Amino acid sequence: GGGYSTDAGFLADVGLRERNLLGTGIDARTNLTLAQKRSQVDISVTDPQFLERNLVAGADVFLVQRNLQSTSGYNERRAGFTLRAGYEINEHLRQSWSYTLVDRDLYDVDSGASRFIQEQSGSTLLSQISTTVTYDRRDSRIEPRSGYVARAGSDLAGLGGDVYYVRLRGDGQYYIPFERLLGDPDYVLVFAVGGGWMLPYNGSDTRIVDRFFLGGESL
């Protein structure tokens, strides 16, 4: 496919998916995105019934390159992997856990970039464990038309690597079908809110690649 994104420019996207890899029930995906200011390769595998239990487990491998010269005066490369697992607590409540190890490189820093960015030029290794609790009262997870969902999560970086911080984050969406308001079933009104808090530790400073941003890279 193709399209246009305000943060990446014109883009092309190619993906392959096998929902039952070699008859194992594993969902395998690979995706390649090429854009004016971004290129990305993702490979992921997911077992929806890991160890024949009510447990979803999977792994992702990724490589991302971003050209931020026009907005921030630097380029960024990320390469790493994520191991993840999730389970249902009850009909509406679920929890997920993940571990991520990623090498980040901030390079080609413009001489006119801020001192804050220039001081962060180079590579860092992020080792992070995360958890998210989701309370979901939507009528559908795939194509919701009514209801709401709320998420609360935390990230701990510093289990190895050279980046140290604690982050708390939360977000939610509320869906109102236009059929209820105007009698038109083809549209849905969505209200969304999100926020986060970050605290570095072990003498570390917050880095621009770890901060919260609004827009295309929202969290």
Residue ranges and their predicted role:
Residues 1-151:
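Gram-negative/organellar outer-membrane beta-barrel architecture
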Residues 1-10, 103-219:
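C-terminal outer-membrane beta-barrel translocator/porin domains of Gram-negative envelope proteins
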